[in-house]
Amino acid sequence: MHKLVSQLVIYRNLPADNLLEPLAEICAEFAAGDYNREELTAEIYEQVHKLLDIGTVYGFDKNLWHNYLAFLLVSCENPFAITCEKVGACEGSVNRFAKHDFKIFQQLFTYDFSELERALGINCFSLISNYQAVVKQERRYNKNISEKVQALSAALEKAADADEFFACVTKFYHDYGVGKLGLNKAFRIAQAQQGEPELVPISNTEQITFADLIGYEDQKQRLLENTEAFVAGRPANNVLLFGDSGTGKSSSIKALINKYYDQGLRMIEIYKHQFRDLSQVIAQIKNRNYRFIIYMDDLSFEEFEIEYKYLKAIIEGGLEVRPDNILIYATSNRRHLINETWKDRNDVTQEDGIYKSDTMQEKLSLVNRFGCTIYYGQPTQKEYYKIVCELAKKQGLELADDFLCAEARKWELHHGGISGRTAQQFINYLQGVADFSKK
């Protein structure tokens, strides 16, 4: 195995925590014959333990060794893989190097650990090659990754030669991409040890769809039209969803990533205090072959906050042009985002050479940089009742509409007023607490 791994070219720079290189070193030590049996066995168990951890995190099953090799192939963000993401393989000499590496991976797929097991009196490699995972009834956060990697693993097992292996891997890159950007829908920003922003996958995204959002058809249509244009590579605008709380603004944004993930849409959630990192985040993603929505939830600024200046420069106004594969979508309960004061409205007062009206115009100019603004207003009483009844049907609650409306009226009086959120909370209450089986 050590000889095989040492001959890799394109896939040479494996992740620092990979298991392939340590296992290759173990096999080399065994082949040389100069080893301590107990120490070598302990080293093997250490790597198998890590493999079991990975299998548990991602829900791998059957052949964990094959699953892991497939996982390595879809995780390595090398130049070849990145050029293939969302477009597939292109003609070029690099394909010969790729097929060279894939021939090695195909040999690793069929690597025989039996001699090692017999000599050390172990059977762990046989066990991980015929592994039966414990079925989890609870929600699996990495189900999306698990299903894709296992499907690729099964396809690679059937590949007859390096050409078929090449076709399977590059098709995966075409369909989903590579690395964390290819395997995950959404990300948050964290500070790496070096102090630079790092994209961290969000594994437990909400599985909401537009069919789950009752009402607001015009608003959803405008949002979909803009996003479809963006995903298709046509001109599109930054979007601001504003209006009353609990009306489905954030849910509409979340539904987008579930609808368009397979078409290359990715979402990055960012908070106000991270706006100064926006330029560095954009630098990391601008050359990747995906469409990115930078998502800002509940966006608003108080008079003393200046983070909006970073946002203005990124949206429009800085020297560097915003890349075509990036848009900013924000939600807010405020129409103008930045809190105004009466001093801002004073056209006469001057302080330090700056007219207060100029200050107000600077603040108001932020919202004007969102080319698409969509208003989500509070539903009427009739619309609220319709939302309640539709949600009840979706959840299989067989209750009369009159009864639902009467109870929903009582509920909203004590739970924040009329809104889609209030309706959903009422349905949650009916499902989880109340016993209306005789109604």
Task: For each feature predicted by the language model, list its residue ranges.
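N-terminal pre-Walker A segment at the start of P-loop NTPase domains
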Residues: 202-228
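Conserved catalytic/switch belt of AAA+ P-loop NTPases
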Residues: 302-352
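AAA+/P-loop NTPase substrate/partner-engagement loops
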Residues: 259-292, 299-304
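Walker A/P-loop nucleotide-binding motif
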Residues: 234-253
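C-terminal alpha-helical "lid" subdomain
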Residues: 373, 377-439
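Intrinsically disordered, low-complexity N-terminal extensions of AAA+/P-loop NTPases
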Residues: 1-157
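Conserved AAA+ ATPase "SRH/arginine-finger" region at the nucleotide-binding site
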Residues: 349-364, 371-385
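Interdomain "pre-motor" coupling segment immediately N-terminal to P-loop NTPase/helicase cores
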Residues: 135-199
